[in-house]
Amino acid sequence: MEKAIPLDKFIEHSLYDKKRGYYINKNPIGENGDFITSPQISVHFSEMIAIWLVGFWEKLGKPKNLNIIELGAGTGEMMYQINKSISSFKQFKQSCNFYILEISPELIKIQKKRNSLNKIRWIDNLN
């Protein structure tokens, strides 16, 4: 009889197992993938997030350092469009530290290619 495993461990194994994990060896996002996300459909979603970020930064009193972290960035399209959208807000962009938390080596490659001109750091945990 097999032991039960906690749900979080099952999900982690199903998505990120080094050999058979759903996100590890392929890109499941987009026209040839299994699903599509809002940033792939239209740039407007990311532009709205960018506008909100600028407004939030202003409400915070324009801090010199603002960490912006995207969790599971897929193809990296949203981070790309956010950086493009804020390019005219120089003071805001200079205050931002951009991070992408990603576990999938395949998706990291895609994200880095898409965001090659943007100053982004990739992380594998929030600690």
Where in this protein do the model-derived segments appear?
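Rossmann-like AdoMet
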Residues: 1-71, 75-120, 124-125
